[in-house]
Amino acid sequence: MRLGFLSVLFGDRPLKDVLKLIKPLGLQAIELGCGNYPPDVHCKVNELLESKPKRDELKAMIKGEGMIISALSCHGNCLHPDEAFAKKNQQVQTNTVLLAEQLGVKVVCDFSGCPGADDESTKPNWVTCAWPPDYLEILEWQWEKKVIPYWTNQAKFAKDHGVNIA
């Protein structure tokens, strides 16, 4: 087992400096933030997707410090009831999976997401209780209409690209 860290904790520093800071601690792996809630300061997904030399440079920098990329992180809310917000998060997730494939990284970390209570919602609704029955109806709608269909498709997409979503 390797011990690692999430790069966004050091978002105020260049990646090269972060790696030099972390190396003496004995950590061997890095999870790179790729956008959505975690900033993409160390891993500009679109730039890396477009440039093999930039991907090679990133991998060499990390390998040069004796580390591996354990995962790419794009925690977001792809199920958000605000369609524009959800689509932006979905695009970051899709591109992160594609980048993981190109980098040879097998894991992309994400949030499951939280839809609204119904199609008219404008804010996510996290159901935390089973009573009164209205809440169970919301939960059933969320799972059957939003969560299961979305993640069934995304799991297949990730699998088709040799990536697991965690």
Indicate where each model-derived feature is located.
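Conserved beta-strand positions in the central sheet of alpha/beta enzyme cores
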Residues: 31, 71-73, 109, 166
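Catalytic domains of carbohydrate-active enzymes, especially glycoside hydrolases
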Residues: 16-38, 100-107
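Active-site beta-loop-alpha junctions enriched in small/polar residues
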Residues: 6-10, 33-37, 74-77, 113-115, ...
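Structural motif corresponding to alpha-helix initiation and N-cap regions
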Residues: 12-16, 51-56, 83, 94
